[in-house]
């Protein structure tokens, strides 16, 4: 073990692997991508559509004279109008103005002028990689989509079961029509499918590309055949020979001859070694082509045939046909592979290209030749190479691509998603620009600002941020939740998969995920495998492919040189694990090493190892790397552990885990909640709200400003700020006056952080023991001690707001003068009718007094005068005050009032906005959900006095009793090892770091624990021979020892956001739905419990007629009946019989709406009016 500093805490580290690379900034991908969008992305779009030219009619000369040209030169970002906090308070979007410099040229005179135009506001990313949209903090999630390029895949045929799958070469562009080349092994024919329509013979398309002659076509599929093997030659009988066959003195067959049996025998007997023949599939395709279209079809005919198939209704003309096909695949306006797609195609077809040059073009090629096409449209060669490769695949199915390989998927980050939206908007503007330009006749009158419609741009971008599936309300329960949200990869969203159509294979873990995408962290519901998380070291290259770092290994020696590889590049190498044994000089100790190669595990000599992984952590995401002893947990439970850490509510006094993994400090550093020192310096002043640090140089001397004063950095801390999920952000200083801090040191803790480390829960003393059935089936028994110590008490901040508007009957008013309200309810309000800060409020209390005018039509002028004189406001206004909802109590910690002047952006008719923040203290309670880090979750079943809890031989009571049956079947033994090591930490007063896959071993822990317990005198139940970490506990109620020794120790427990108090709900009378007149549902609407169809059957089965009657009528939608019952209960009378439920009336109305004449009669045959029943 060695010691190391994590944040401001020293830990003992068990890990043996020394990582050559620090974990990179965890939100760097988001920040870099947004920076790229501002610096390059915006301009790329503008450049793509410039110059914009217009033709104008000048009065003094000929028509259609040269007009103006607009060119976009550069972009500039202004300063935000409001700061982040103001945007949150006022419900605005945090954005910056975008200015574009436009160069206008008069094409007639050559005059040039440059102008800067305002192009609207762009939502701007905060330093924490979030956006503030309409006052709410949001995150743009990275999207994982199929990369454009060419794919070679097999598709099962719909024909009979014995048929072979069809092989497809699929060209997938970013924009434009698909092109699929198909090889059908059942029909022995090459086909092409243009734009997902009908299939046709491939040679028809090749004819249009200029391969007129049949021999030219077959040349593309030439291959060498062994001329000495007669059997092989006989298989090719009927093929056309593609080059002259000659011996030294005789020409046996010339190019173009058909190979017959006699000729085959003759060739086999001669001394010719190799002859050039077309591949059998090409030959059969040609025959099929001739059968369908005849033998002498020209390229014009081919164009016409294709046009006929694609546009059956139109008259085929040669020019129209040529243009149609050209526009489909060869025009940059209609078709685009993008840079990424071209890069993928070039690398995929490189081998085929090399072979094509050798075989078809018969040229000498260097080994390292590249397929260096640069055009982003389809080229003839792409089609030819793909077809040729497809023909080879028939006998080499192992060369097919896997759709789910990460090499074929790319990540669309924030920058790219915003660029796409900007381009969508700009295309609309571009068309308008062209039209508007033609209006101007004089150069001096052209002003860009008048040409650009800013609204279009802003609406499109705003719509994306407000409504896109990829723009999500930020998960802010704790710092880890926020960090993970920004590192999320989603396969769903526009242009991605749909939840319903996602196959099992797409969701599954793939070997190419290694080091790029976490195989563990993913949701448990419908999105399993579609929403994933980036691995700790993963980064993204310029094309959007995921990269992971490796160390180079040369001749069995590990170097410190690091290379980043994409998933498809990695397939070529032998890669060793990071945990293999290496001596001090970097030489691999074992002579034979286990390596990964192309998704397989194999053993090779150490000299053949090419690369080595950086760290055992590199496989998993940040959340998962926070689970100690992950290697001892089942993957399903680790998944739950990863997900539940994100749901841990920040407790009042955060406590870092005794048993950590070493990643805690890094997660806290990048979460943005820990305040880090920007410069080296000395702490001059500290209080709970701000820290002042005076900068110093290397020698400790103060750094002075130009005026000779020492430079001071002031850090303002956040105090009790509400998050998106109503948890609390509160920062506390962790430095003292006079302390020297280095640049990057933590100087203040945030929520769920302790001494600069992530601290999501508490270290709790636990025992694994069944206790009177109170911990049956994952229930948890808790000691009263945890309540007294406020261990799991959390603070939640609720925000309530109300708006005073102008109504048709007059303005609403915020006032303390509310009609028919007792003095008791007004005691906490100030003279303006707004609750005072510091007041303790509970459900039903008034937070903001508000009255709304209600219309009264029968007021005579005399009444109006009397009212205005005596100020009798009682009858013309109704009380619409903001009240504390049911089940909430707490202290008012802040009130914000905004007047009309401050909130001009809020929309018309709003006079005042009041926001009241109430902090609620929620101690641990029965029904709350607790969990460990290993997916071991449970619900508190009972809280019993400390003196009744089982206790150690030295009298220490345990704090939580867990069921031992929760461990074996779930296979998350990590929790038991954590418990032992945690106890060792508590006894020796140490903190540990046990990195995943490289942590403490069981015997190490037991050895040390036995020593520590012996020293403390609590080694009863543990023998020197068989160290098991168990102890003889006594029952707190009787004082008698339990029958067997019990595992006790310290486990890190989290209180999750599923708090019983927030979920419990009861209703007596409440709101009803407008049409059905049935009670609403759900706690939010103060609704009732649904008594559904099956529940009705249950009561019917029991014969509970009166109960059933009541449930279906007066408790539901019999309006008259429920009022009568209410009166009867108040007056103590018998409950009257039921009336007619509203649902009956609704049914009648619906049937009448279907034009059926339905009427209702009483028993005497008199017609009744449904509306009056």
Curated annotation (Swiss-Prot):
One Pfam match: RNA_pol_Rpb2_6
Keyword Magnesium applies: no
Keywords for this protein: DNA-directed RNA polymerase, Nucleotidyltransferase, Transcription, Transferase
The keyword Lipoprotein is annotated on this UniProt entry: no
GO MF terms held by the record: DNA binding; DNA-directed RNA polymerase activity; ribonucleoside binding
Superkingdom classification of source: Bacteria
Top class in the EC scheme: transferase
Record-listed E.C. numbers: 2.7.7.6
Reaction it catalyzes: RNA(n) + a ribonucleoside 5'-triphosphate = RNA(n+1) + diphosphate
Disulfide cysteine pairs (residue numbers): none
Assigned GO CC terms: DNA-directed RNA polymerase complex
PANTHER family reported for this sequence: DNA-DIRECTED RNA POLYMERASE I SUBUNIT 2 (PTHR20856)
HAMAP family named in the record: RNApol_bact_RpoB
Quaternary context: The RNAP catalytic core consists of 2 alpha, 1 beta, 1 beta' and 1 omega subunit. When a sigma factor is associated with the core the holoenzyme is formed, which can initiate transcription.
Protein family: Belongs to the RNA polymerase beta chain family.
NCBIfam families cross-referenced by the UniProt entry: PRK00405.1 (NF001616), rpoB (TIGR02013)
Function field: DNA-dependent RNA polymerase catalyzes the transcription of DNA into RNA using the four ribonucleoside triphosphates as substrates.
Protein name (Swiss-Prot/TrEMBL): DNA-directed RNA polymerase subunit beta
